[in-house]
Amino acid sequence: MENLYALILGIIEGLTEFLPISSTGHMILGTTILGIDIDEFWKSFLIIIQLGSILAVIFVFWRKLFQGLDIWLKLAVGFFPTGVIGLFVAKYLNALFNGWVVVGMLIFGGVVFILIELAHKNKQYRINSLEEISFKQAFCIGIFQSLAMIPGTSRSGASIIGGLLLEFNRKVAAEFSFLLAIPTMIIATAYSIYKEPELLGNANSLIPLGIGFITAFIVAVLVIKFFLKFISKFDFIPFGIYRIILGFVFFYLYYSGILNAGSEFKL
């Protein structure tokens, strides 16, 4: 069963990491439905499969990444506020590890996506390529991304919203969000290992780890390509509606006692 669970969680990770719908929320549902007790091995597993998602971004965007130094400088500037804010608020984040926070942020984020799209209907966007993004705008996106430290927000959702507010077109907002995930997720993963080095020692079951990693990579590649095609034709309103529905699903699960708003959240 361990290998099957690894496959399912790898699919969930690949499907949700880069869509603006909260990968954390879906991982809570997945582990709860499967009845997985998040022990040290599964903590290690969840870290490893994120690396598969990071590799997917590099695989899809490798040409853009090696076009020159400019994009790397913008990513560094974009990561800077997230890193600094993270260092200062990390010790206070435990207070937010609550299912009701997830509910609120899922619904709030969904409403924001819908309102932004309605406000920008038929509007011409000013930023239509990665090259047009200024360092100031990259820094602002990093500030928005830092909001993803609040559970249920969605890292990609927060940074995409930032891009839309700065008048990036949808594709550019999504692409910069995906690329900004590379330094953000790598450093976040390294920090998790630094805090709990014993997690690497628990990653001793190579088959499920390999299954989860490869599955997350393949699914994330497909999702990124699909998502970019989707938003070239449609807006983000469907994702906003989905977030709201998911938020109310969690509300019911927590209110009815099916899920514990405190304990089940702490992955």
UniProtKB/Swiss-Prot annotation:
Class in the EC hierarchy, top level: hydrolase
Q: How does it sit in the membrane?
A: Multi-pass membrane protein
Q: Name one GO biological process term.
A: response to antibiotic
Residues annotated as transmembrane: 4-24, 41-61, 69-89, 96-116, 173-193, 207-227, 239-259
User: EC number(s) for this protein?
Assistant: 3.6.1.27
Provide the leader sequence positions: none
Q: Which Pfam families match?
A: BacA
Its GO CC terms are: plasma membrane
* Molecular-function GO term, any one: undecaprenyl-diphosphatase activity
The UniProt entry's coiled-coil ranges are none
Where is the protein situated, by its record's location annotation?
Cell inner membrane
> Carries keyword Protein biosynthesis?
no
Tell me the keywords, alphabetical order. Antibiotic resistance, Cell inner membrane, Cell membrane, Cell shape, Cell wall biogenesis/degradation, Hydrolase, Membrane, Peptidoglycan synthesis, Transmembrane, Transmembrane helix
Q: Which reaction does it catalyse?
A: di-trans,octa-cis-undecaprenyl diphosphate + H2O = di-trans,octa-cis-undecaprenyl phosphate + phosphate + H(+)
Q: Which family does it belong to?
A: Belongs to the UppP family.
Check the record and name the NCBIfam families matching this protein: PRK00281.1-4, undec_PP_bacA
Q: What exactly does this protein do?
A: Catalyzes the dephosphorylation of undecaprenyl diphosphate (UPP). Confers resistance to bacitracin.
- PANTHER family in the cross-refs: UNDECAPRENYL-DIPHOSPHATASE (PTHR30622:SF3)
Protein name (record): Undecaprenyl-diphosphatase
